[in-house]
Amino acid sequence: MTTTKVKTVKNWIDGAWVEASTADTEVVPNPATGEAIAYVPLSGERDVEQAVASAKRAYETWKTVPVPERTRYMFAYLEQLKKNREQLAQLITLENGKTIKDARGEVQRGIECVELATSTPTMMMGDALPDIASGIDGSIWRYPLGVVAGITPFNFPMMVPLWMFPLAIAAGNTFVLKTSERTPLLAEQLVSLMHEVGLPRGVLNLVNGGKAVVNGLLNHPDVEAISFVGSEPVARYVYETGTANGKRVQALAGAKNHAVVLADCELDKTVQGVIGAAFASSGERCMACSVVAVVEEVADAFIEKLTAETKKLTVGNGKNDEHFVGPLIRQSHKDKVVKYIEQGVEQGAELLVDGRNATSEEAGYYLGATLFDHVTPEMTIWQEELFAPVLSIVRVRDLEEAIALTNRSRFANGAVIYTSSGKAAQHFRNAIDAGMVGINVNVPAPMAFFSFAGNKASFFGDLGTNGRDGIQFYTRKKVVTERWFN
């Protein structure tokens, strides 16, 4: 493996690409081949200080720019993203590993997030009520917070950052972005395209790194709010540390999404839907289907079809269109998932399809689609977020048992039901504990103009991302009562 021509990514601070203050770096491999494609700096406190200081200086001017003018930058950015959509998709596949089809889908979802940001003037409109008392009018106004920060994961290196900084910036804030050290090249490209539309320096800053950068942002007195997406332990840490320091925090965390399959479902469509929800993006997404609760009446027929279709899924380099499952992000993650599979077998689950047997011509971090039957809630593979193409089947008596099973999980991000019964779907919608619910919808992640967040250990905070929640998170309200004598 040669690394002689592999570049080291830089930080974007105060309108320029600058080297990190620390010499420490981490290799960024292509998950499909294991070959180094970049080095990412592990920036430190000094880099965070410089980025926040730049954002704070820029805020004093940026907050006075009229909101329609701020939004015009988003319209221009939108065109840049559309013009470069294929390049962005190829870059996602290169450093994340997901298939090119999934990468193109992510690019489209990212574009939709920026489309939402172009509606900021409408979303920031306040409310007014005249004559609330004799000669007194009342109104509500929205203002930006100041310097805000975003900490984003590797699994959606385009969509999640675009949940955050376009909306925050259009609302009048300035932004410090800390993306995953596993996918720095896509972040570099997103910032470069934003720079090309002429965004004033300091409005958007990028600091690469790991825990030192996270702690620097959490503890910096000039950072007003932090948006985070990642694992449950880190989300809990970010929320507790950030709020203890007086910051507004939204922390989207882990998931164990369940799909409920009833006897009256459209069986073939349900099987294909579950396969896409469970195994696309190699299962490395917080909305992946991880458990199917299928009623006994249809269990054998459903599992027979699901097993046959799962065995057909090809595994390999995501740049090739014919592959359905790409590599996992790192060898260390693959090793962890393999241990979960071993635990499933040891604890009594029936392994119907073993993804450990997947082979590829390239030396990447490959794990094929894996399917378990006869899983119980006492098993580790039911309890933990695996973040992998591993699907567990639990057989249940009826809808009530399926709902109770789903609600037993400590996670509550998304849940889906497959049924032809409106009555059953309505009951499921009302009884299930999940932030996002799908009815014959494979992945219940709505468009960007709806809010996105889970419940229980899947989310820490009050306001989710996107939609009305998004604009409320990045702004504060002022309630004004006024009377005039002249």
From Swiss-Prot:
Q: Which UniProt keywords apply?
A: NAD, Oxidoreductase
Q: Output this protein's name.
A: Malonate-semialdehyde dehydrogenase 2
What's the domain of life for this entry? Answer: Bacteria
Q: Which GO terms describe its molecular function?
A: malonate-semialdehyde dehydrogenase (acetylating) activity; methylmalonate-semialdehyde dehydrogenase (acylating, NAD) activity
Q: Which reaction does it catalyse?
A: 3-oxopropanoate + NAD(+) + CoA + H2O = hydrogencarbonate + acetyl-CoA + NADH + H(+); 2-methyl-3-oxopropanoate + NAD(+) + CoA + H2O = propanoyl-CoA + hydrogencarbonate + NADH + H(+)
| Species this chain originates from | Shouchella clausii (strain KSM-K16)
Its job: Catalyzes the oxidation of malonate semialdehyde (MSA) and methylmalonate semialdehyde (MMSA) into acetyl-CoA and propanoyl-CoA, respectively. Is involved in a myo-inositol catabolic pathway. Bicarbonate, and not CO2, is the end-product of the enzymatic reaction.
The UniProt entry annotates the active site at C286 (nucleophile)
Give me the disulphide-bonded residues: none
Residues that hold NAD(+) according to the record: F154, K178, E181, R182, S231, E385
Parts forming coiled coils: none
Q: Which CDD domains match?
A: ALDH_F6_MMSDH (cd07085)
Gene Ontology BP terms: inositol catabolic process; thymine catabolic process; valine catabolic process
Pfam families associated with the record: Aldedh
The UniProt entry's sequence similarity note says: Belongs to the aldehyde dehydrogenase family. IolA subfamily.
Q: What sort of enzyme, by top EC class, is this?
A: oxidoreductase
Subunit structure and binding partners: Homotetramer.
Q: Answer whether the UniProt record assigns the keyword NAD to this protein.
A: yes
Query: What EC number(s) has UniProt assigned to this enzyme?
Result: 1.2.1.27
Its pathway, per UniProt, is: Polyol metabolism; myo-inositol degradation into acetyl-CoA; acetyl-CoA from myo-inositol: step 7/7
